[in-house]
Amino acid sequence: MIKRSPVREDLPQTLLFELTPQHALNFFLGAIVILAIASLGVQFGLYYLPEYPSKTILSGLLFVDCESNIPTMYSVLTLILCSVILGFIANAKRAMRGAYINYWMTLSVIFLFLAIDEFASLHEKLIEPIHLKLNTSGFLYFAWVIPGAAFTFVCLLIFTRFLGHLPTQTRRLFLLAGSLYVGGTLGMEMIGGYYSSLITDRNNIIYSVIVTIEESLEMLGVAVFIYSLLHYISYYMKGTGLRINIVASKKKRRSA
């Protein structure tokens, strides 16, 4: 919500942007539902409907398994948003001389890396070399899940103490968000890998459904995580906010 602050007429007016955790969550949930329906819709049209203009173009723009399209940009931006909020919390904690500052900042860096990985599909570059090295198949057909699972386990070990110090509700939300995200990233990826190992061509509606569920779980996990961060700020960092002042350059202020 945007509203004007109650200040005197002769003073500059300030617009306050008020964001509640629930409003943010509702927005992201709506976006996820729209993206999931659009992804399945264009794939259904691709495989079952007669030819129509922009048939393959729409699939490229909206199917969640394609690169550099609308769902990818949504995921990248929400991961960057997580990184920004985590960095904001870390800096606020530093100003208040709070605890676990390095953990908050490390999480910020991790989410920035996840955003870069989402944009550039770095993890997929691990599939072929690991697959050739270990001759993986079945649930490990997409072999990057092996280092992915190891990375997840190491992060869980490192952040166990940090999770323990969080308020109970925040900790539960963090764990829920992580479970959804990992369930999509690794769990559904393994199911998709198993299915892919049984067929010769992944261009079918069944694989499209698997991938859409996978990406939707990832998006849902990120949405819940953003909600948990905003909830943490609003309940346990009361008085913390972000204000943006728009000022003239020094040169213009001197000449005024």
Spans of model-derived segments:
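Hydrophobic cores of alpha-helical transmembrane segments in multi-pass inner/ER membrane proteins
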Residues: I2-R4, P71-F88, I146-L157, S216-Y232
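Alpha-helical transmembrane segments of multi-pass membrane proteins
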Residues: G30-P53
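Interfacial helix-loop-helix junctions of multi-pass membrane proteins
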Residues: L49, E124-K133, I191-E214
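Perimembrane loop-to-helix junctions flanking transmembrane segments
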Residues: E51-S68, H131-L134
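Membrane-interface helix-boundary motifs at transmembrane edges
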Residues: N91-N102, R161-L173
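Alpha-helical transmembrane segments of multi-pass integral membrane proteins
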Residues: Y103-F111, T168-G193
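Membrane-proximal helix-loop-helix units in multi-pass membrane proteins
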Residues: A115-L157
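Short, highly charged, low-complexity non-transmembrane loops/tails of multi-pass membrane proteins
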Residues: M237-A256
